[in-house]
Amino acid sequence: MLLNSKRQLAILLAVLSLVALVLVGRWGNARKIGGQGPAEPFRIAGNFYYVGATDVAAFLITGPEGHVVLDGGYPTTAPLIMASIAKLGFDIKDVKVLLNSEPHPDHGGGLTVLQQASGAQLWAS
């Protein structure tokens, strides 16, 4: 892009500065919660639901004898998962099994919080 005047350069710098300020503010807030934000929970199919955050997946499988949560995200993801479960009309106390799919903090970091809230068994694959 060719800038024809000092005025165009000043406008460009002002816009870039504003964008940078917005991004820095959002980045700082995202860092406080481990990079996640709340995501709208939804039914994938049948009794299988998405209950994760914006960048960490977690799933709820419901059943008449209790529910299963697959992965718990980071420790800061657990409250988001519990809120999603409640928003779908389910109770965290009805979760009987927490299943960890792999030994990474973005899959298992929140399982302790979820286990304390639900009393569920913890299974690891």
Task: Label the predicted regions.
Residues M1-L16:
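N-terminal Sec-pathway targeting helices
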Residues L16-R26:
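Hydrophobic alpha-helical membrane-insertion segments, chiefly the h-region
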Residues R26-G37:
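Ser/Thr/Pro/Gly-rich low-complexity linker/stalk segments immediately outside membranes or between
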Residues G35-I92:
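Conserved beta-strand hairpin/beta-sheet module of binuclear metal-dependent hydrolase folds
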Residues T76-T77, A86-S125:
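Active-site HxH/HxHxD metal-binding segment of metal-dependent hydrolases
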